[in-house]
Amino acid sequence: MDQRLERILPRVQKPARYTGGEYRQIIKDKAEVDLRLAFCFPDIYEIGMSNIGMRILYATMNQMPGVWCERVFAPWGDMEAEMRRAGIPLYALESGDPVSEFDVVAFSLGYEMAYPAVLNMLDLAGIPLRSADRPELTPLVIAGGTACSNPEPMAPFFDLMIIGEGEEVNNEVLALFRQAQQAGWSKTRFLETAAKIQGVLIPSFYVPHWNPDGTLHDLTPTHGAPARVTKRIIQDLDACYYPTDPIVPSTEIVHDRVNVELFRGCIRGCRFCLLYTSPSPRDRG
């Protein structure tokens, strides 16, 4: 552990949020991986570790040979102040390495209230906020989750967004990214190729047009991007990996119990709800 971190932890609430080392966390040999991904949840540890979607995707991406997915959470106010005062950048729990050193920085956007935390985490990591200010392929800043169904509010900040469910498309994007790294592709070439994957939205490839009242009128696609991105849906949940040995938190979390996904979707079909546009509930066997 960074000695600077050891000095500040006694001065913050719930230091176990920031130490890692939990039972069943996934540790890999850096010499045996060629793609490192910082999986960022834009809220505090207790909320992020209660999120079953994050647990599923963390385990799924770590199933890929040569890929190491590590967790990153937003610090509470006291810890953020101490980190900024001590010059400690945002870091991953598993290795303690700065987020800026990772190949891919991926955010889970479950709700719009997390948007400010995303920008704060990027700033704390020392990563330029806007995609246009990050011309290199790495770090690639991406996002997925329910809130990406309305991508335009955060479009200037992400290089790539996942629309729909991530178990399959995440792995496809990571496989393409590894190919791009090995072949020395430019960021633009990678994004143009990634735009052909179902469920992938490249925000910079769409020019927004606004109404006089400030609302969005339409988007003009560029770089050969599709006019409409079709979201990815997992039709057979049993065909996807599901973690049976999740990480055991070292401190109390919001849902301090075992979470099991029995089905995905909703039978109600309320027209005002995003789930109305998703398939009827799909059960796990």
Where are these regions (language model features)?
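N-terminal [4Fe-4S]-dependent radical SAM core
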Residues: 6-38, 45-46, 203, 211-259
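N-terminal cofactor/phosphate-binding cores enriched in small/glycine residues
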Residues: 41, 49-50, 54-70, 107-108, ...
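Residue-level signal for short, function-critical loop segments
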Residues: 41-45, 111, 264
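Glycine-rich beta-alpha loop elements in corrinoid/cobalamin-binding modules
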Residues: 74-221
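Non-catalytic terminal/interface segments that mediate subunit docking, oligomerization
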Residues: 254-258, 268, 278
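Local cysteine-cluster metal-coordination motifs and their immediate loop/turn environment
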Residues: 264-275
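Single conserved hydrophobic/aromatic residue that forms the stacking wall/gate
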Residues: 276-285
